Amino acid sequence: MAAEAGGGEPLVKFVKLSGRAAGSKKKVRWFPVRRLFTHSCPSLRIPSRFLREGRRSPPARSGHRCVADNTNLYVFGGYNPDYDESGGPENEDYPLFRELWRYHFATGMWHQMGTDGHMPRELASMSLVLHGHNLLVFGGTGIPFGESNGNDVYVCNVRYKRWSKLNCRGKKPNRIYGQAMAIIHGFLYVFGGTTGYIYSTDLHRLDLSTREWIQLRPNNPPCDLPEERYRHEIAHDGQRIYVLGGGTSWTAYSLEKIHAYNFETNTWEDIPTKPHGNLGFPAARRCHSCVQIKNEVFICGGYNGLVILGDLWKLNLQTFQWTKLPALMPEPAYFHCAAVTPAGCMYIHGGVVNIQQNKRTGSLFKIWLTVPSLLELCWENLLKYFPQLCQLPTHQLLQLGLSQELIERLK
């Protein structure tokens, strides 16, 4: 059986922004978007093939990914086997979501983005990172899980709303899903993942300048490599890549000791971490989320093989001290997605919230992981008490004293 793939507020408190509770059956009308063909590019079309009437947020889903900048949260892909929630017979990609959404922070509104080009079809447990104005997507699986995996890199420029497949050379990773990915020093690193049947401990690197893949061969003996895994997360400090959790269909790995890949020595190292007093260490988990702010890494939610977790932990990459934060997810989830803004606000969307009923949620929550700057506090209050700000023309915004950077966040 293939491995599953879908699966002014107070600080350190989750705030719900949008979304319907798991299992909501609100009827939605779906409208196909016409396909566009040209002689020069016969495959050109709008891949977000359905626009929804009366729905202001993405349907409940799991196995999707998200990234954030100062202005938007971008949510791509996902999976929901619930026939009605996924659009029924009018959704050609059921039970997957071949679509890209953005949540605009300034207005609190969701927008399904119409895009041109070649959107990937591997829509569950892919990897997604933000590089400038580009979304980079790698891997993932279609349906059935493990039978239609990907190993190409797709790029979507969010300004021009166009997808393209990156032409790469060299030794690409296998067709996998559930891998972890990060951009470090101009290289795209991919670690682990699964074919659906075989789990990986491979580490690959793509040079984003030359577009050449290589498989890194660490100097360790095979017995010293990390255990094969999927649905883990990675963090980095510029000198090492740190692997956090993950597992297989039958296990979840501990967070008491962390595997770290050393760039300089080309070796894997085992780094013990420090517990949070009597609270100890975070539970072993897979299918959790992870965001990083400088040298602090935050993990949230996940699944330990028995229960869905809703806790929030912080790891300092200089001291390797774990700290349990005094916040719990309002809807404990796994196979959810999370992203953090440059200002330090984390957004969490979707995920599986009930194992027995196989229910997913479409809820969106936010939580500040750092003390917001005075600018951010003033900005949030300005938007709260002057919501029509987004409707003003640029010259009026400039007259009000807004900087060009803040004006860009209104678009």
Swiss-Prot record:
The keyword Electron transport does not apply. Component of a CRL2 E3 ubiquitin-protein ligase complex, also named ECS (Elongin BC-CUL2/5-SOCS-box protein) complex, composed of CUL2, Elongin BC (ELOB and ELOC), RBX1 and substrate-specific adapter KLHDC10. Pfam families: Kelch_4, Kelch_KLHDC2_KLHL20_DRC7. This is Kelch domain-containing protein 10. SUPFAM superfamilies: 3-carboxy-cis,cis-mucoante lactonizing enzyme (SSF75011), Kelch motif (SSF117281). Keywords: Kelch repeat, Repeat, Ubl conjugation pathway. GO terms for biological process: positive regulation of stress-activated MAPK cascade; protein ubiquitination; rescue of stalled ribosome. InterPro entries: Kelch-typ_b-propeller, Kelch_1, KLHDC10. Belongs to the KLHDC10 family. Kelch repeats lie at residues 72-133, 135-186, 187-239, 240-288, 296-342, 345-388. Pathway: Protein modification; protein ubiquitination. It comes from Xenopus laevis (African clawed frog). Substrate-recognition component of a Cul2-RING (CRL2) E3 ubiquitin-protein ligase complex of the DesCEND (destruction via C-end degrons) pathway, which recognizes a C-degron located at the extreme C terminus of target proteins, leading to their ubiquitination and degradation. The C-degron recognized by the DesCEND pathway is usually a motif of less than ten residues and can be present in full-length proteins, truncated proteins or proteolytically cleaved forms. The keyword Metal-binding does not apply.
